[in-house]
Amino acid sequence: MATPAPPRAVVFANDNETPTNSQRSGRPRTKPRPAPNTTVSWFTGLTQHGKQPLAFPPGQGVPLNANSTPAQNAGYWRRQDRKINTGNGTKPLAPRWYFYYTGTGPEANLPFRSVKDGIIWVHENGATDAPSVFGTRNPANDPAIVTQFAPGTTLPKNFHIEGTGGNSQSSSRASSRSSSRSSSRNGRSNNSSRNASPAPHGVGDVVGAGTLSVLLDLQKRLADLEAGKGNKQPKVITKKDAQAAKQKMRHKRVATKGYNVVQAFGMRGPGPLQSNFGDMQYNKLGTEDPRWPQIAELAPSASAFMSTSQFKVTHQSNDENGEPVYFLSYSGAIKLDPKNPNYNKWMEILDANIDAYKSFPKKERKQKPSGDDAATAPATSQMEDVPELPPKQQRKKRVVQGSIPQRSAGVPSFEDVVDAIFPDSEA
């Protein structure tokens, strides 16, 4: 009799088990992507095509942001050196500058106006140095905003704003990719952005509508700026303005390139009413000197000046009416903290500017003869080194000197006429 086959084991599937690759339907699981860089600027960069570094006049250089206030418009431009790998090695590319708000980006821990290579600070009038609420951009979620500046902003030569001109196609492709990503997210928020974004509806909205709103807001802001509702364009100092500045009290004046330090406050020197601070560059540019932000940090506030100075009223002279003229003399001290990130820059500035007048090139002033001496000796100062010639040779090359009445006062003698015609003959 045949042996019966053993019963087949029955296995019940677990609903929680994951099917194997052979049983799984649909596309295979994709590899996890690395986390995107979350320290990217909100704005497109500025490409530098020359040796001149990026620089903006005071009060300029902050990209337009539809959601920012003047107090928030402060930050830094950071240079990014680029290179490309070729068959013969690496080839450097034109550097590109990107803007970040204060307290954000790769230099988030850098104090406002700190000196560092490849970093320039910009701010609008009325901006504060507080860390910004705008954070940085996640390129996987949001496209870059094309950099735009307020009317009147002076962009250095050989700089190109990315996203304009030849880059319009790439910007369009980036917008379409971002639009498809945004529609699949269904309004998810950007975890890398802190608190706020320059986009008018925050992060995660459909890019088409968001971009249109940004353009409308920027257009309105540009119209307000042109109409004078926003920040005014930098004022050009004219001769009339300089003359009006002279009417201000001396200690209330502001030296600029159009009304320099010497014009506003006088020559540098050791006198009791003179200042010994200022090199040639500072004397020429005043507050438009690129070093001015660091120089201004050394100046005390009005409260500190009045509260930390030694004062003394001194009598210097009398005016035209004989009334006494008094001056308020003061002296004080400022501690230079070596822990401050600008300490080395301060020492460099102080070393270059204190008593710099002593090394200025001296100009020789021509003394103008006064009174009768001007008529009798008009050109003696220019002829001092000429050797004295014999009498006859002097008559050969006679130089008529003196005023017109003097030249016509006398008539030459017969001997002078003969010597002039026949220089080798004897009278």
Swiss-Prot record:
Localisation per UniProt entry: Virion; Host endoplasmic reticulum-Golgi intermediate compartment; Host Golgi apparatus
PTM note: ADP-ribosylated. The ADP-ribosylation is retained in the virion during infection. Phosphorylated on serine and threonine residues.
Modified residues (Phosphoserine): S132
Bias type Polar residues, positions: 15-25, 36-50
Xref: InterPro entries: N_prot_C_CoV, N_prot_N_CoV, NCAP_bCoV, Nucleocap_CoV, Nucleocapsid_C, Nucleocapsid_N
Chain residue ranges for the region called Disordered: 1-72, 144-204, 361-411
Compositional bias per record (Low complexity), positions renumbered to this chain: 167-197
Disulphide bridges, residue numbers: none
Domain CoV N NTD: from-to ranges: 38-163
Pfam families given in the database record: CoV_nucleocap
Location of the region described as RNA-binding in the Swiss-Prot/TrEMBL record: 34-172
GO MF, any single term: RNA binding
Region (Dimerization) residue spans: 249-359
Domain CoV N CTD: 238-361
Residues bearing the modification Phosphothreonine: T147
UniProt KW keywords: ADP-ribosylation, Host Golgi apparatus, Phosphoprotein, Ribonucleoprotein, RNA-binding, Transcription, Transcription regulation, Viral nucleoprotein, Virion
Chain residues that bind RNA: R82, R96, R137
GO cellular component entries: host cell endoplasmic reticulum-Golgi intermediate compartment; host cell Golgi apparatus; ribonucleoprotein complex; viral nucleocapsid
Annotated family: Belongs to the betacoronavirus nucleocapsid protein family.
Job of this protein: Packages the positive strand viral genome RNA into a helical ribonucleocapsid (RNP) and plays a fundamental role during virion assembly through its interactions with the viral genome and membrane protein M. Plays an important role in enhancing the efficiency of subgenomic viral RNA transcription as well as viral replication.
Binding partners and assembly: Homooligomer. Both monomeric and oligomeric forms interact with RNA. Interacts with protein M. Interacts with NSP3; this interaction serves to tether the genome to the newly translated replicase-transcriptase complex at a very early stage of infection.
Protein name listed in UniProt: Nucleoprotein
Taxon lineage: Viruses, Riboviria, Orthornavirae, Pisuviricota, Pisoniviricetes
Gene from which the chain derives: N
